[in-house]
Amino acid sequence: MKTLLVEKNKIRANLETVKAKAGKAQVIAVLKANAYGLGLREMAQLCREASIRRFAVTEPEDAVRLRDWGFGEEEIIVLRSTANAQEIQQILQSGATATVGSYDAALALHGLAESQGMVCDVHIKVATGMGRYGFLPTEIDRILSVYRYLTNLNVTGTYTHYANAFKSVKKTQLQLDAFLSVVEKIRAAGFEPGMLSASNSEAMFGCKTDNLDAVRIGSALGGRVIAKGDHGLQRTGRLQSEISEVRWLPAGCPVGYGSAYVTKHPTRVAIIPVGSADGYMVEKARSSFGFKECFRAACSAMLSFFRRRKYYVQVNGKRVPVIGHVGVNHTAIDVTDVECGPGTVVQLDAAPLFVPASIPRQYVD
């Protein structure tokens, strides 16, 4: 049996840290990707208990789920701009706030809302550096057309998303400047941009940019941010499993794929039925980062080739080393000096985001 242990007391502490760091800015809890693997429903409840009443999701169906679970008073912002009729219907059905990132998406949303006699709240997305959803700063006329002609859309906010907050304050500030320039043009035309937001977890904890009216915080809720320094956040999410088999191996016996580890002396080895398929030892692709991060990763990999980095798990309160490469479904550990056997509980650190939803989440205080 495998479970992901989620410590609610750590999440509660993180929520208070986030609120304090946000200052006067509203906190929008980003609960996309099953709340970064921590569990959408449970995280929404913890946020509600912390008086955070604005949620953001990526998938319109998540907005429907939250409403069905009783989150009827909270504002739910769908962060993905869409022109898909089925997804638009889910947004309208749930009373969520839609993201409008193109005039085509705005037209599609307006048309369906108008046909049903509805007015949909929307946030305008401005693309200042991500290159995904959003109006380009040069498309100010299209943004203003949303205000002028699409009367079934009610603009309640405007936002952008930082691409480099985890590594470049300068680039982040340039994005903010570009965003605020668009905001000023909206106001100069006689329209209100509504609630302004730009900062994500990395920006709020790693940069000194303006928090504006609201911050959108996701990964920090689980205590996992790339930004350097001690931010007062507590990491949560531990895989828990049981030892399936214990055996003695003689000296000179290889362990795992590639024979990367060879026993130097008789070794008592335990097998845990947990591997990369369960999210253990899985991290974001290095291609999502810059040259410096990739260079550091390459150096680390080269160093590991000559001097293998050690990883540990917890067995009966003791740190036990992982030996050999982690497999898809199995991990070997050295338990020569640890009293344990089949059925002994083992805890492993894993980013909840990569732990499959099929593995139950167990919430503990």
Which residue ranges define each predicted feature?
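Active-site-proximal beta-alpha core segment in soluble small-molecule metabolic enzymes
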Residues: K2-V6, K10-A13, G23-S197
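Active-site anion/phosphate-binding pocket segments in diverse small-molecule metabolic enzymes
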Residues: K2-E7, R12, D104, L176-D365
